[in-house]
From Swiss-Prot:
Subunit: Tetramer of two alpha and two beta chains.
Gene: trpB
GO MF assignments: tryptophan synthase activity
Taxonomic source organism: Thermoanaerobacter pseudethanolicus (strain ATCC 33223 / 39E) (Clostridium thermohydrosulfuricum)
Cofactor dependence: pyridoxal 5'-phosphate
UniProt protein name: Tryptophan synthase beta chain
UniProtKB keywords: Amino-acid biosynthesis, Aromatic amino acid biosynthesis, Lyase, Pyridoxal phosphate, Tryptophan biosynthesis
Enzyme class: lyase
One Pfam assignment: PALP
Database matches in SUPFAM superfamilies: Tryptophan synthase beta subunit-like PLP-dependent enzymes
Length: 391
């Protein structure tokens, strides 16, 4: 593995972390080639997480929009309610293989934290989750859920007290406890081999979707659309389609209150190339290279960077990156709930918002797959607040 996607990616880390990364890459390479390991991974995806997830034809939505056929890849139906578990099961099996007794993770919306705590409970591992104090306030339900699962939740009070700071704390902890601790990163970010490893554990989404659409339609889709924070759900569904040049890949970032307001998280649209969390990629930073505060109604998308492979897909023109505002995401959230009886995560609602803009301009012969990366239970409070409803 080269660890680079064009000029992006790499391993911008202190010496102390280098050896752990080399060991991790070696073990991951071996595990990937090990039939027993992959079989065990697939066993847990199937029996524990409930895969394969359906590829659902959203007939009502399609008819109402009056254009392209819209299919939803139902990652919201996974155990713990999002795509996160695909990656966590893989990494925790790897931790077990490496004889690590303790796992740590960062979390923003709390979904990755919940998934990590869930798998740690099942495999009997000690688990500590780092979470920004701001996010803890926004996601109190997920915080309690992690504690219920036996994890220790450590509030991060530095910087903007959000995801970026939680990552920094997790890295600090990892460096200190490198012998017994495995760091479970939640997205296709961080130093090599993480972006590749997380993508490989998430590609099951795209592998299934490809097989399912061929079964249902006898051909590949015209568009595959997914939301992008760090970008693991998007990378997971994009990757198996990369060689299929006729399939357009579209990543949707969070435009927050608008791309010109400074209150957004659209690193591809407004960012520049820099280094954060051990990788070179597009970042929202000022002239001095300081990371700028980011904002989105959806806690899972407010990351100031993006996975390095996405940066490469953008630069090589293989994927296109667009954005949706809070307002558009909220409208899509309500719309899907009332049209299909599916309450999507606010993250996924960003992808949906763009698909709903695109579909009416296409013909009935066109096919769109939207990655419905998670369910919206965790967002009901947020949406109620926006609508002025007291719960």
């Amino acid at each position: 593995m080269s660890g680079r996607f064009g000029r992006f990616g790499g391993q911008y880390v202190p010496e102390t972390v280098m050896n752990a990364l080399i060991e991790l890459e070696r073990e991951f390479e071996k595990a990937k080639e090990d039939k027993d390991f992959m079989e065990e991974y697939r066993y847990y995806l199937r029996e524990y997480s409930g895969r394969p997830t359906p590829l659902y034809y959203a007939e009502n939505l399609t008819k109402r929009l009056g254009g392209a056929k819209i299919y939803l890849k139902r990652e919201d139906l996974n155990h713990t309610g999002a795509h996160k578990i695909n990656n966590v099961l893989g990494q925790i099996l790897l931790a077990k293989r490496m004889n690590k007794k303790r796992v740590i993770a960062e979390t923003g919306a709390g979904q990755h934290g919940v998934a990590t705590a869930t798998a740690a409970a099942m495999f009997g591992m000690e688990c500590e989750i780092f979470m920004g104090e701001e996010d803890i306030k926004r996601q109190s339900l997920n915080v309690f859920r992690m504690k219920l699962l036996g994890a220790k939740v450590t509030p991060v009070t530095t910087g903007t007290k959000t995801l970026k700071d939680a990552v920094n704390e997790a890295i600090r902890d990892w460096v200190t406890n490198i012998d017994n601790t495995f760091y479970v990163i939640g997205s296709v970010v961080g130093p090599h081999p993480y972006p590749t490893m997380v993508r490989d554990f998430q590609r099951v989404i795209g592998d299934e979707a490809k097989e399912q659409i061929l079964q249902k339609e006898g051909r590949l889709p015209d568009y595959v659309i997914a939301c992008v924070g760090g970008g693991s759900n998007a990378m997971g569904i994009f990757y198996p389609f990369i060689e299929d040049k006729e399939v357009k890949l579209i990543g949707v970032e969070a435009a927050g209150e608008g791309i010109e307001t400074g209150k957004h998280a659209a690193a591809m649209a407004k960012g520049s190339v820099g280094v954060l969390h051990g990788m070179m990629t597009y970042l929202l930073q000022d002239e001095e290279g300081r990371i700028m505060p980011v904002y989105s109604i959806s806690a899972g998308l407010d990351y100031p960077g993006v996975g390095p492979e996405h940066a490469f897909l953008k630069e090589s023109n293989r994927a296109q990156y667009v954005y949706a505002t809070d307002e558009e995401a909220l409208a899509a959230f309500m719309d899907l709930s009332q049209t299909e009886g599916i309450i999507p995560a606010l993250e996924s609602a960003h992808a949906l918002a763009y698909a709903m803009k695109l579909a009416p301009n296409l013909t009935k012969d066109n096919i769109i797959i939207v990655n419905l990366s998670g369910r919206g239970d965790k967002d009901v409070n947020t949406v109620a607040k926006v609508l002025g409803v007291e719960l």
